[in-house]
Amino acid sequence: MAQMYFYYSAMNAGKSTTLLQSSFNYQERGMNPAIFTAAIDDRYGVGKVSSRIGLHAEAHLFNKETNVFDAIKELHEAEKLHCVLIDECQFLTKEQVYQLTEVVDKLNIPALCYGLRTDFLGELFEGSKYLLSWADKLVELKTICHCGRKANMVIRTDEHGVAIADGDQVAIGGNELYVSVCRRHYKEALGK
């Protein structure tokens, strides 16, 4: 029986690395995984999942208009899929997360989703909210704050490295824009 997994964390915990390792494990056993990533994130090239340690793989793209069930079903009909791996899953819509439950329940294909739990304001992303609600298994990937405690928050910084507390929920960037911190240092950085 297939299940839907949500691997979540703050930034720099190795979500993409873990996804790529999972894909490799399936391939090593002669199985066919399909990788999807958000079209909005093209930092490392269009249609690619890349990790900070240098691993990368080609990926199918999704945006807010993508019918995830139909896209996966089409791939599955062309060549049997053994799992679906979704990077940057926080950018999924509620409807797309529901479509993933249909992939799991109707097509019997496991869905392994990797993404951020919350944004720089501490608010859930839409995709993360529904993955937390509907996933069969929740797995927290851990990273650390500069103080050594578990980092479970993300701060967005300006060009001078100062934490900012307003702006659009989505701003694509890496270490130059975001810092993973513990809750205490998150509150201190934002003056809360």
From Swiss-Prot:
Keyword Cytoplasm appears in the UniProt entry: yes
Enzyme category, top tier: transferase
GO biological process, one term: DNA biosynthetic process
Annotated GO CC locations: cytosol
Pfam family, one: TK
Binding annotation for ATP: 9-16, 87-90
Keyword list, A-Z: ATP-binding, Cytoplasm, DNA synthesis, Kinase, Metal-binding, Nucleotide-binding, Transferase, Zinc
Subunit: Homotetramer.
Protein's name according to its UniProt entry: Thymidine kinase
Native species: Aliivibrio fischeri (strain ATCC 700601 / ES114)
Primary gene name: tdk
